[in-house]
Amino acid sequence: MTKQATNAVLKKGQRFPLTIKRLGINGEGVGYFKRHVVFVPGALPGEEVVVEVTDVKPRFAEASIRKIRKSSPDRISPPCPVYDQCGGCQLQHLSYEATLKEKREIVKQAFERHTTLRADTLTILPTIGMEDPWAYRNKSQLQLKTEKGQVKAGLYVMNTHKLVDLSSCLVQHDATNEASEVVKQIVQDLQIPTYNERKRTGILRSVVSRVGFETGELQVILVTTKKDFPKKDLLVEEIKSRLPHVKSLQQNINPKKTSLIMGDETISLFGEETIEETLGDISFSLSARAFFQLNPKQTVKLYNEVKRAAALTGKEKVIDAYCGVGTIGLWLADQAREVRGMDVIAEAIEDAKENAKRQGITNVQYEVGKAEKIIPSWVRSSWIPDVIVVDPPRTGCDDQLLKTIKQTKPKRIVYVSCNPSTLAKDVEQLQRSGYKVKNIQPVDMFPWTAQVESCTLLVYEGK
């Protein structure tokens, strides 16, 4: 439908009743007005609402709730005082039990929309949730901003320059909440300039804190625009004094005009360069920029699903693509003949090697680089993988990697996904090359958000 036709039907400011049919991939309610898709943040399936159009796009419209005529029985009051402003969570107004069902439904809808597979023929298992879905995040990344002389540390409202000050967050571990609040107060006391995005002035951009759930070790990273600045030594001393349990204090320098949190250079200000975390029987060393799953308790459940899907017997050669600090590969190593992994972040690979060494795991090998370049070189040297595990970013697998996988033809692919849409699109390509989806296991890694993690098993059956 053309944009002109859409504008002829829907206008900004227009109000009308709407029945919500389902949840969208971003957690918004989805309804249809004269065959036009309308996204309504905060609305739930089955609800009858009166909405006001806030924006009209070529293929859909966005609207806000003006009145709820018929409320969902699954609607609850959000416990977070800044839930409507922050945007970090999208589903605190939906009961947790219902959230788990909806996340499975989001996966199903993604396959209906992006594949030729019939969703009713797929084995999509019930979502694995948490017993206590609060205080689960081990890492906090808050932007710093000074307004009317007051230093704020928080998150930006989506698509705006408004920063919501977060003195505490219900989904963050208490240690990260404390660290962020203490650093914010020190910056206020010392009057250190925070970064001004518009003027590109100031020093401190962000405070990042990470805690080991099992070890209790705390890491604080100060993201700055330059390496040296006034009162830097005093800032370090104050953090050491007010956060005496901090094990690792790092500085990351990011001088660029970018939405990315961290830059390329990290230096140690105090203590160790890494902190330790334990998953199951395996301990991991985490540097400032290293990726590590944000919910350790659910990570163990997810990785056990990966191990179950891989179905290793001790004879298989396994590739851990997008390996990060080696978490998945090391989890599988005791049941594999050999595990090889790669990642584009050099520090992550160094951590992966160190993690393997510390565990005494000798049947693993890690390289810096892109999977789509490294895997063919292994194949050329007659090292053919039996199982490939992929855990890509939200954008999904690189097209060249998918091409490489299809050429390599491993017996099994275990696809760990954080985005049902890109998962479905990638699966569509793989199933055309002879792979069959055996099952999809959603895992709720981020309670109260719209994000859905999943573990999908694909088996090569030939064309």
From Swiss-Prot:
Show which residues constitute the signal peptide.
none
Q: Which UniProt keywords apply?
A: 4Fe-4S, Iron, Iron-sulfur, Metal-binding, Methyltransferase, S-adenosyl-L-methionine, Transferase
Q: Which GO BP terms, alphabetically? A: rRNA base methylation
Residues forming the catalytic site: C418
Q: What is its EC number?
A: 2.1.1.-
Recorded GO MF terms: 4 iron, 4 sulfur cluster binding; metal ion binding; rRNA (uridine-C5-)-methyltransferase activity
Q: Which domain of life is it from?
A: Bacteria
Domain TRAM, residue spans:
9-67
Q: Where do the annotations place S-adenosyl-L-methionine binding? A: Q293, Y322, D343, D391
**Broadest EC class assigned to this enzyme:** transferase
Q: Which Pfam families match?
A: TRAM, tRNA_U5-meth_tr
Q: Which Gene3D superfamilies match?
A: 2.40.50.1070, Nucleic acid-binding proteins, Vaccinia Virus protein VP39
Binding of [4Fe-4S] cluster: at which residues? Answer: C80, C86, C89, C169
The record's annotation in NCBIfam families points to: rumA (TIGR00479)
Q: Which family does it belong to?
A: Belongs to the class I-like SAM-binding methyltransferase superfamily. RNA M5U methyltransferase family.
Name used for this protein in its record: Uncharacterized RNA methyltransferase BH0897
Which species? Halalkalibacterium halodurans (strain ATCC BAA-125 / DSM 18197 / FERM 7344 / JCM 9153 / C-125) (Bacillus halodurans)
